[in-house]
Amino acid sequence: MKDTTVTAQFAIPAADWKVLAEKADLPKEAWGKPCFVAWTTTPWTLPSNVALCVGPKIEYDIIETYNPYDAEKLTLVMASSRVAAYLKPEGEITDGGELPPYERGDKYVPYRVVARLTGTELEGLHYRQLMPWVKPVEKTGELAPKFVNDYAAAHPEKVFTGEDGRDRFVEMESEAFRIILGDYVTTEDGTGIVHIAPTFGADDAKVARDADIPALYLISKKGETRPMVDLQGKYYTIDELDRNFVKACVNEKAYGHHAGDYVKNAYDPHFNPNGIWDKKASEKAEDLNIVICMEMKQEGTAFNIQKHVHNYPHCWRTDKPILY
């Protein structure tokens, strides 16, 4: 199937850039905004991102360039072998001179590679949450991983009880949004950096848990930990969520902008009149992936947006794309 994909910019905080710059023997002040870039075919999962995964032996370039949409100065990190997929060789500056200015619409984007590191050298660096709609949270107790209970014990101010008074949860924002290692990362496509959303994939869940990364769950009115997308294929509405969880972990304005939106048109009742899926109409209409990508472009967090043909699992009975 053909989907709208995005290569997202995950901003690197100043303190982590200084660590990265020291490893790469670069100035403490980055050229423009420093970012890790990661590609995804499912932009609707980006609000649930909690980590970025790199291959331990893969080489990664640090590149000074511009955002092709708004010409913002950027310092990017991506796999060395994937640079040519995003930046034309005609734009590379190799003589050590200053990058020429860039304006949107120019034939190519100027860039230069200033350093190269392995994935292992990137491990542990942090980045800013791309879409700070919801803070990561975990349920504490006997069945919780040790790192969750240890964190809750060390940070009692982060612990809260569900509105039904039964279960206790801990907000774990500080433990997420960092670079982790994964042997399954490849450089066949994308940037060589994988966006990790544990609630939407078994591989993501395993690599995150192995690295003590908390998941980004929502907590329902019933006190259940749930992915951001419900079983009808839409983002949960705020009134379906535990009030104490919302108070502790949800940016109501940011999340509320898309609360209740269907992540695939195939599940939207508008395209299922009388329970019959109008496949042609749903595929023709703009879907949430496109909306999210356009919002990212306006916010300056999208480095590349394009259509991509790929294999995606579908239900054999309804022919609809599978979400879980």
Label each PLM-derived region with a short phrase.
Residues 3-7:
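A contiguous, basic/glycine-rich beta-loop/short-helix subdomain that forms a polymer-engagement track
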Residues 16-36, 43-324:
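Non-cofactor substrate-recognition interfaces
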